């Protein structure tokens, strides 16, 4: 079967061509896919150059010195669904090419080069001059308008520019902002993942220290149980304080990521608006929001070693050795025998507070 002939019914009118073109837009450069086109494991497509750009933004340390290509390995997230893409030693060049999409692009370009008599471009009309199309952009008032408004109307003293020029400029500006947000979101996600690992390390270290405390206190007599409980409570408090702080940071980063992702989605939807004037009516606000979101400064991450719980290590060997010297004392009263362990407990507490003691 000839693929071109079988595909032509989908390209029969302007509406179908517009719908098809939307499916052939790269989510990174916001232009039609450029060859080679690679397909990700999540089945989304990217220009290989754009995939390389996203990978380098997410993995700056993997970039070869003095080169713009990545030699091997690494990972990044799909800008469409956030699925993590793990690369082999060939980097983005190890991703499979989507020859079907490349063929569709070739067919689309061939068909779109032919005149479509049924295709009639729609224009927004000027509210002041109902028979005039909106065809210029007022730089002073930052609104689309018509030629009569410039000659006779409210914008006669304003500076204007052709509508396509401002359309391309602001679309490029918004595209750059979206690319920065996508790269920033990958970095935020990496920070969240690192802090989740910090939480796990804190829990693991706390669990290990509790086990160590239990093992050491099992060799002591009952008079040390109260001290053991106090140390466990201190450890639990520190663990909870650290976990609360890190989880609070995770929530903050997560909220920022959610807000940023929603803004990216809104901006991408705006980029799909085919009408230049309608697009420009809302582009400025989106550009400002994207710029403001890109400049948001998040709280700092926990300092190195924050997950360590080594300060709760307890040395009881010298205390156990001292307790092993306790023996019957001929002639001692039962009251003295009961008081003696309390004195030992006090000595043990003093020894624990002096890490340099014998």
From Swiss-Prot:
InterPro entries: COS_domain, TRIM/RBCC, Trim54_Bbox2_Zfn, TRIM54_RING-HC, Znf-RING_euk, Znf_B-box, Znf_RING, Znf_RING/FYVE/PHD. Its main location: cytoplasm. Residues 271-329 form the COS domain. Residues 326-358 are annotated as: Disordered. Residues 334-345 have a biased composition (Acidic residues). Residues 194-258 form a coiled coil. Homooligomer and heterooligomer. Interacts with TRIM63 and probably with TRIM55. Interacts with tubulin. This is Tripartite motif-containing protein 54. It comes from Pongo abelii (Sumatran orangutan). The lineage of its organism: Eukaryota, Metazoa, Chordata, Craniata, Vertebrata.
């Amino acid at each position: 079967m000839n693929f071109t002939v079988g595909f032509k019914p989908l390209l029969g009118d302007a509406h179908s061509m517009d719908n098809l073109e939307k499916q052939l837009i790269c989510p990174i450069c916001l232009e039609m896919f450029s060859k080679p086109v690679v397909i990700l494991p999540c089945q989304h497509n990217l220009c290989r150059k754009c995939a390389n750009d996203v990978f380098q933004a997410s993995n700056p340390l993997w970039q070869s010195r003095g080169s713009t290509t990545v030699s091997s390995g690494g990972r990044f997230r799909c800008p469409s669904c956030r699925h993590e893409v793990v690369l082999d030693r060939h980097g983005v060049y190890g991703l499979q090419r989507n020859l079907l999409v490349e063929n569709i692009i070739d067919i689309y370009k061939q068909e779109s080069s032919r005149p479509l008599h049924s295709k009639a471009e729609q224009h927004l009309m000027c509210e002041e001059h109902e028979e005039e199309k909106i065809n210029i952009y007022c730089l002073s008032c930052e609104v689309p308008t018509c030629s009569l408004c410039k000659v006779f109307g409210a914008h006669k003293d304003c500076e204007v520019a052709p509508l396509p020029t401002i359309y391309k400029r602001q679309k490029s500006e918004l595209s750059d902002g979206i690319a920065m947000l996508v790269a920033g979101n990958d970095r935020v996600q990496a920070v969240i993942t690192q802090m989740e690992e910090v939480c796990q390390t804190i829990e693991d270290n706390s669990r290990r220290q509790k086990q160590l405390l239990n093992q050491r206190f099992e060799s002591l007599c009952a008079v040390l149980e109260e001290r053991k409980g106090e140390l466990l409570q201190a450890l639990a408090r520190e663990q909870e304080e650290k976990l609360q702080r890190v989880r609070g940071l995770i929530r903050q980063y997560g909220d920022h990521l959610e807000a940023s992702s929603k803004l990216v989605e809104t901006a991408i939807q705006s980029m799909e608006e085919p009408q230049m004037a309608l697009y420009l009516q809302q582009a400025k606000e989106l550009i400002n929001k994207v710029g403001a979101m890109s400049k948001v400064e998040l709280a700092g991450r926990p300092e190195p070693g924050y997950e360590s719980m080594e300060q709760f290590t307890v040395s009881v060997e010298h205390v156990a050795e001292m307790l092993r010297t306790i023996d019957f004392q001929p002639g001692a009263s039962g009251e003295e025998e009961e008081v003696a362990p309390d004195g030992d407990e006090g000595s043990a507490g003093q020894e624990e507070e002096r890490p340099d003691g014998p």
